[in-house]
Amino acid sequence: VNWDEENNVKRPGMNYLSSMQAIALGSNSVLYFQWRKSRGSSEKFHGAVVGHDASEKNRVFQEVAWIGKDLEKLSSQILSTCNRAKVAIIMDWENWWALSDAQAISRKFDYTEELLKYYRVFWEKGIEVDIISMDRELLDYQLVVAPTLYLHKKEYIHKVEAYVEAGGIYVTTYWSGVVNETDLCFIGERPHERLLGLSVDEID
């Protein structure tokens, strides 16, 4: 890379080992950035398969060719491993911006840390998770977790209601459903009160 202090070349065979390890762990491909070194600009010395020598004889090119030949042999024996996550965590940029602007919560609050609390639980148990926005379809998932979803877009709650009615499990947390998509507080009933079967009487 062009941004690190030291860039050690991989030892002979290490590229092959890490590539086959990725395949063994479920990857469907081995990809490289970049294929050819540029002649100028900031990435002209960035690692690449084809170097400035434009040769097929150097070690990097030879190892990549070796990997390609072996992957071709394996291609008929390895099944596609494109798993589809059954769990989704909602991380929404507009929600993050609105939370960052809200002057009613502690400055110690960190939206990304809040999301990671939930993600870590699934990760430690080996459960795959998709990170999605409020705009995505929910019906593809068995469980949707929406931590601190302060901002609710106009049609979002209808989507959640349809998801729950279809048998989906929806988990949300504190400080959710407070403002609409223009960052204005909801007046009267909050959008998820009927869905969750609760109401907020007081905030401390």
Indicate where each model-derived feature is located.
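Carbohydrate-binding surfaces of carbohydrate-active enzymes
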Residues: 1-204
